[in-house]
Amino acid sequence: MSNKQHRVPDFYCSYLLRSIPKPNSFYIGSSPDPVRRLRQHNGAVRRGGAYRTKRNGTRPWKMVCFIYGFTSKIAALQFEHAWQHSYKTRFIENNERLVTKKNTRNGIATKLGNARLLMKHPYFDKMNLHIRFFDRLAWESWELNKFKVDYGLSLCEVDEAVLTDESQLDELDELNLERIKAFYEDQMAQESSLLQRYQDNLTYDQKSCMICDKKIDYIHDEGTQMVGFCSDDECDFLSCLSCLYKEFTKNSKQIIPKSGHCPNCHKCLEWSQIVKYSTVLREKLIKD
């Protein structure tokens, strides 16, 4: 049996494609690299891409939105499968289903309604998933919320450039790829910068948990406990991950918290992000 520590992926998303020449054609997938995956679907990369996106007359595709923040690859694949099979997935209650038959054709409003239903399920809800839009019509459909599914508005993001987009039809796929690339690269740069700050904090000197006062020494102790940080640039809070977990759940009935406030600066922090950086940092420092 492997003793390998679970690591939250740097990035993994479940995405919705829409055919530009055939706007009633959609495709749902998942990937750790949406830029490369979109290029595969559009034939710019020879290997990869799904059979359904290769059908005559459907290319090029644009990625109208993706959902990200999954705490594991398995969770992202489960979301993808549930989104593709919304008519039967266990993650949507029977009395809430928008689609009840396999071959029912449904438009953007139904696709996004199903995304809302999945995001509100307790299993995915605890991950604090975000949905990012790269298409104005898709974003407007989300905002309209045709099926009145009450979830996700606070975690909705939209690429502001698409709100004033007047691009020609033959430019849409290239601009869509550029916007997704810009967001993905910015996201990865932010992740790298934050991780480097945490790493510097741990390796420059011996630290102590600011809750239990236990010494935290990543310099000499390879088996040291995982650590939780505050993401605020002006806050130097750190603690044992287990101590922060107890702090976040002491007045809650939730086994896994969604969020909590930094004991030092009181900023609201997403638990899934704290765990993510804790696992990545531990793996990186042990390897180094």
From Swiss-Prot:
It comes from the Eukaryota. One of its GO terms (cellular component) is Slx1-Slx4 complex. Its cofactor is a divalent metal cation. The keyword DNA repair applies. Its EC number is 3.1.-.-. Residues 10-93 form the GIY-YIG domain. GO terms for molecular function: 5'-flap endonuclease activity; crossover junction DNA endonuclease activity; zinc ion binding. Keywords: DNA damage, DNA recombination, DNA repair, Endonuclease, Hydrolase, Metal-binding, Nuclease, Nucleus, Zinc, Zinc-finger. Its main location: nucleus. The keyword Amino-acid biosynthesis does not apply. It is found in: Nucleus. Transmembrane segments: none annotated. InterPro entries: GIY-YIG_endonuc, GIY-YIG_endonuc_sf, Slx1, SLX1_C, SLX1_endonuclease, Znf_RING/FYVE/PHD. One of its GO terms (biological process) is double-strand break repair via homologous recombination. It is an enzyme of class 3 (hydrolase). Belongs to the SLX1 family. Catalytic subunit of the SLX1-SLX4 structure-specific endonuclease that resolves DNA secondary structures generated during DNA repair and recombination. Has endonuclease activity towards branched DNA substrates, introducing single-strand cuts in duplex DNA close to junctions with ss-DNA. This is Structure-specific endonuclease subunit SLX1. It comes from Kluyveromyces lactis (strain ATCC 8585 / CBS 2359 / DSM 70799 / NBRC 1267 / NRRL Y-1140 / WM37) (Yeast).
